[in-house]
């Protein structure tokens, strides 16, 4: 190898396009594999326009409905066919300020983080009074951790309520914006054809939590470490009770041409839909007779009629019911005036079984909180890393199944197998439960003005 030299370069000229093209035209064996034969491929440095029928987006404000727009209430809004396709739903809520009394000098109070997820216990999109899709606050927590990309996560977190804001006795007023993660909001190609569903009544139902379920009262001493949650709040603790000052929903519709309406109404309109199904929570019961806890615990996932695209799950710490989304061993508390989260992992290894065989072997839990979301989701959780996911699909964000499984085809039940961490086994004063949500897929179609669903049974229920 020759020794490099350093010299002044005063004669070099810029290459011309003709000279560069001569280099590009030269081919070796490896170039033929990389670029392919010229007669079969072309590189276009021109923006190609994908033509479509003319349409326009139409936002519509929904304010009227039946029920109670208040804490602990249920409110149902009709979604009239203001357009041809329903693209998305976004909820806007304003909560008034409040004050508490008698909490003690060393106590502080705050709304829970991501308040929009907690305020709405569940939201149901109904067709003729039957739920088509139901989203729980637990699902919205899990979905946002994995499926809101890092570039938008901070903004999204602020929209839905942000983090804790502790005060001595005052509860701040809050405004939250919640983009409701319905399946069709990710891809307009599967927008709900509400204009064609002339024989169906479409509504959206919101179930609100009680105000006492949305606040946490913690101990914050002037010096030293705090003791965590002081007590569960009751309505008697308020001198001024917060209220839902306003609640409204914006529905985005697409309005298309008469030609497209006529053409799509000639034959049944088929489309894919996704439906999250919450698995009933199961408390982890530890032996009390002095025997050793089992090495692994298995939790059966309720069988569904549709395909299974992904699993979201975690072991929630339920020692204090105020924490609706805490999935670690060791509760947070104030220390030297700062709030500390010193929680540790609840699980060391995770596997997934179909019937009695491992579809996914017992792998380190990090595979389900880091590797899986890195490959299949939009974001790897950075703080709430007690949540886990496994995606059977290669890309969870797209609506394409891409590897989703249908347990009905092989008459199989799915089970999540957990090996508890050492800290979980040693946590004798804390209680835990297994939470899971299954993301399932179905085929919908509109025929003769009615929406129907294809699964192993027939119409949607």
From Swiss-Prot:
Gene Ontology molecular function: structural molecule activity
- Composition bias of kind Polar residues appears in 1-18
Sorted alphabetically, the keyword list is: Capsid protein, Virion
- Write out the ranges of the annotated region (Disordered): 1-22
Cysteines joined through disulfide linkages: none
| Subcellular location as annotated | Virion
Q: Which InterPro entries match?
A: Capsid_N, MCP_C, MCP_C_sf, VP_dsDNA_II
Q: Does the keyword Nuclease apply?
A: no
The primary site where this protein sits is virion
What cellular component GO annotations does this protein have?
viral capsid
Q: Does the keyword Nucleotide-binding apply?
A: no
Chain's role: Major protein of the capsid.
The protein's name: Major capsid protein
Q: Which gene encodes it?
A: MCP
């Amino acid at each position: 190898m020759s020794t490099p030299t350093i010299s002044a370069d005063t004669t070099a000229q810029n290459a011309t396009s003709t000279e560069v093209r001569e280099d590009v035209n030269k081919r070796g064996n490896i170039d033929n594999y990389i670029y392919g034969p010229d007669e079969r491929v072309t590189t276009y440095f021109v923006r190609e326009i994908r033509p479509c029928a003319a349409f326009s987006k139409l936002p519509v404000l929904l304010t009227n409905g039946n029920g109670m727009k208040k804490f602990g209430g249920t409110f149902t809004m009709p979604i009239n066919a203001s357009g041809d396709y329903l693209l998305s739903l976004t909820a806007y809520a304003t909560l008034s300020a409040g004050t508490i009394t008698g909490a003690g000098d060393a106590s502080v109070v705050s709304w829970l983080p991501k308040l929009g997820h907690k305020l709405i216990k569940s939201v149901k999109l109904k067709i003729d009074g039957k739920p088509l899709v139901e989203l729980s606050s637990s699902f919205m927590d899990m979905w946002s951790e994995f499926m809101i990309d890092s570039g938008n996560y901070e903004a999204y977190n602020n929209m839905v309520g942000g983090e804790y804001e502790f005060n001595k006795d005052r509860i701040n007023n809050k405004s939250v914006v919640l983009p409701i993660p319905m399946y069709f909001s990710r891809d307009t190609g599967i927008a709900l054809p509400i204009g064609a569903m002339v024989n169906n009544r479409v509504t959206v139902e919101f179930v609100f939590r009680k105000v006492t379920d949305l606040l946490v009262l913690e101990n914050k001493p002037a010096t030293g470490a705090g003791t965590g949650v002081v007590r569960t709040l009751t309505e008697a603790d308020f001198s001024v009770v917060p209220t839902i000052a306003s609640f409204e929903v914006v529905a985005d519709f697409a309005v298309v041409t008469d030609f497209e309406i006529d053409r799509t109404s000639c034959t049944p309109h088929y489309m894919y839909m996704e439906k999250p199904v919450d698995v009933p929570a199961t408390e982890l019961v530890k032996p009390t007779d002095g025997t050793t806890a089992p090495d692994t615990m298995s939790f059966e996932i309720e069988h569904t009629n549709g395909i299974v695209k992904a699993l979201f799950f975690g072991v929630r710490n339920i020692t204090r019911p105020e924490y609706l989304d805490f999935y670690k061993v060791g509760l947070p508390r104030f220390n030297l005036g700062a709030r500390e989260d010193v929680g540790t992992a609840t699980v060391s290894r995770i596997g997934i079984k179909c019937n009695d065989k491992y579809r996914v072997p017992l792998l380190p839990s990090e595979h389900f909180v880091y590797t899986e979301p890195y490959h299949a989701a939009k974001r790897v959780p950075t703080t709430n890393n007690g949540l886990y996911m496994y995606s059977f699909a290669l890309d969870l964000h797209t609506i394409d199944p891409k590897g989703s499984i249908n347990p009905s085809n092989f008459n199989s039940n799915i089970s999540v197998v957990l090996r508890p961490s050492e800290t979980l086994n040693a946590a004798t004063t804390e209680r835990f439960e297994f939470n899971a949500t299954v993301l399932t897929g179905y085929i919908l179609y509109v025929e003769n003005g009615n929406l129907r669903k294809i699964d192993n049974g027939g119409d949607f229920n």
